[in-house]
Amino acid sequence: MTRLIIFCIAVCLAGCATHKKTTVQHKAAPKPTAVVKEETAPAPTGMSETGIAWQKSDRLIPVLEEAQKQHKPVFLEFYATWCGPCKVMEREVFSQPDIYDYLNKNFLSYHVDVDSPTGKPIAEIYEIKGMPTVIFVDPKGVALETELGLITASRFKKVADSALAKMKK
């Protein structure tokens, strides 16, 4: 019995002696204007039926460049195909004519599937923590307004109005 206890203590001490201390190096988050060369995922089912004129680009950078030419902010919608609240926003907010007309007139709209290989880097740039997330950015990619979670059409319009006002300053 004594030998068993001594053996167990020896094994524990040996395990402690060989344990290496590891450090995790966190890379700095890239700036929103960082080049993202990945392609974007296609719109979720029905998204094109909302009336929003989604930018058809395989990268975010050309959308920002177009926003600079047009002097417009960009509406970024971060979603996931499995996200129930994302589908509710699509159905109850983005399908309203006053919302999509307002977006089409005042913003360039771009959507990002956070689970796609091409959407993940963009979601990392903007530190997306949940879906749906809407971010309004200036043509340089700097966030003007951010809203996380399911929101009403009236709240969405207030956030968009605020972003537009900040853009005009």
Regions found by a protein language model. Give the residues of each.
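Short, low-complexity, disordered segments immediately C-terminal to signal peptides
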Residues: 20-34
